[in-house]
Amino acid sequence: MARNEIRPIVKLRSTAGTGYTYVTRKNRRNDPDRLMLKKCDPVVRRHVDFREER
């Protein structure tokens, strides 16, 4: 299997509407659905939800 098939690169976009993104890798076997993580958004200076963007 190729490296990118199991762990693709995904963008996590802020739900605060600032347009800030994080880039990470995800394991498709463990997380087949879209990721949602709480991370710091430096534009609004708060922890907000970041959702996977396709």
Curated annotation (Swiss-Prot):
Entry keyword annotation includes Ribonucleoprotein: yes
InterPro entries listed in its UniProt record: Ribosomal_bL33 (IPR001705), Ribosomal_bL33_sf (IPR038584), Ribosomal_zn-bd (IPR011332)
A GO BP entry: translation
Gene Ontology cellular-component terms listed: cytosolic large ribosomal subunit
Gene Ontology molecular function, alphabetical: structural constituent of ribosome
Keywords for this protein: Ribonucleoprotein, Ribosomal protein
Listed SUPFAM superfamilies: Zn-binding ribosomal proteins
Annotated PANTHER family: 54S RIBOSOMAL PROTEIN L39, MITOCHONDRIAL, LARGE RIBOSOMAL SUBUNIT PROTEIN BL33M
Similarity comment text for this entry: Belongs to the bacterial ribosomal protein bL33 family.
Protein name, UniProt field: Large ribosomal subunit protein bL33B
